[in-house]
């Protein structure tokens, strides 16, 4: 039966099945505990940074994979320790944060020192690419640690879940509207399949989900609508 489907239907089926598996993993990690959520983010961080550095190497750059990934892990650990309500490592969150900050302050100079001995043709490019991986991948994922405690000082998984729902609503509506109604391309040179119709469809889906989140969580509607727009 699958051979009789059009390419669009096959693509939709693959996206649906993979999305369902991803949804189970992500939602399960968020609902299980703060630590499982942190482990999921950390796995995404390491995988994302290694992929980023791999792509950078294909473009002729020479990032410091080990130091860059280590800096990203430490940055994540700093933020997770700061928001965690039951961390006991090194005597508590404040001690863990201080220790991680000291380690982070050592890692950054270490990148510059190591670059002196790597004998690369463009050391500035190597350092810049390494730091870009930290800023582009590790920093956003580290800041996601704060989302479940927005509006309170306790772990509230449903805040994170609805934040994820907003992202998914944007992706799903953008894909469906773009696939069925997409006519005007946004940036054909960079992404030939992205259309303005899909963009506004995704925006509408995100805003609708933001409104639902505000009602379910009994939170500020305008705050969630603003979050959805961003």
Region roles according to the model:
Residues 2-228:
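Membrane-embedded alpha-helical bundles of polytopic integral membrane proteins
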